[in-house]
Amino acid sequence: MIQVEKTKMVDAMRSVLPGVDKGSAGIDGANLFLFKDNRLFTYNGVTSVSVPFAMEGAKFGINATNLFAFVNKLNDLSVNIDFVQDKDDPTKMKSVKVFSGKTKATFALADTSEIEKYLEGIKFTDGKPCPDNFNDAFALAVIKNNIHPEMKGVVTTKIGDKTFIAASDKRRISVHELNGDMDEFKVDDDVLADALKLGKPKTYAIVGPWLHLGYEGDVTFSCIRQDMSKFNAPAMLAAMDKLYAIEPVVEGKLPKSLSDAIGRVSALAGTTNTNTGLTVQLTFSKEGITAYTEKNDGNAEELIPWDSDVKFSTEDSVQSWVSINILLEAGSKVTDFKVVMSNPAKKSYAFLFTGEKYKALVGGISVKEG
């Protein structure tokens, strides 16, 4: 019989729940707690979360939802665990009894062969320090609602002696400088968002195809890295630097009421093409930004006055169609912006957002397509 503290067991199970929350019907064992090698594992087909948990070397799998719900409701401070042997084969376990005080439950053991096969490649090693602004940098750099599967995700990339985290959806490049060195990798942004729910990672390690993020209490979040070959981050950053060097035609801070106004006129927003989704035409003038949308036989517009000083270096009309989702997402993160003429021949403009260590490029759509 094994006796463990209830609090420690509940904390351990709770810390690995991100590995079962999204389960995977295609993998047997995606809904399990796997106890193996004195660690507790979960794996949902995409990510694995594990934490040290002494179980005298025993290996077994139990339905995660049921075990967590039962142990979490126990009143006593300790939990007892006993293994029931198979009568026909004493070398095998048939079930596990979990009891505390006068409350007891028996859990059938699950087949863990498939989940163990996927976890064979996981090898733990001493991690390198993770930059202290990694979570904040990801929150700013990530691009939500990315409609291009091959671009979806975030990458870390090195330019000179600096490391950046970057994302792109072909119409926008979003970049944030990290406060420290980090090896290069690409991971799915939804997966990384789950990892950061565990808190701020202290260490990271790349072992084979896996990225490991280490947290307090020796909790480890593991996920499979993605192919970086279609994400040329250095070229993207070079393109951004080139645009930032252009003299802006408009420069200032976005009006605080821009988001609400865009929300109102978006009711009549149409789709420009498959790369953009819903679009809005922005016209920059000294009075403010005029947001205009059209769909079928209707249209809507609203003038959003400036609420701070804005610099203009041209008397020409500065006007372009922009993806609504991209504009709102970038504008919700930083309010400082520049507008530069990216292609004088076509009179197309690029919108540049700038924070202390954050930059984002939002490409304009110079010709409205049907």
Each model region followed by its residue ranges:
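Structural preference for solvent-exposed beta-strand-turn elements
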Residues: M1-G370
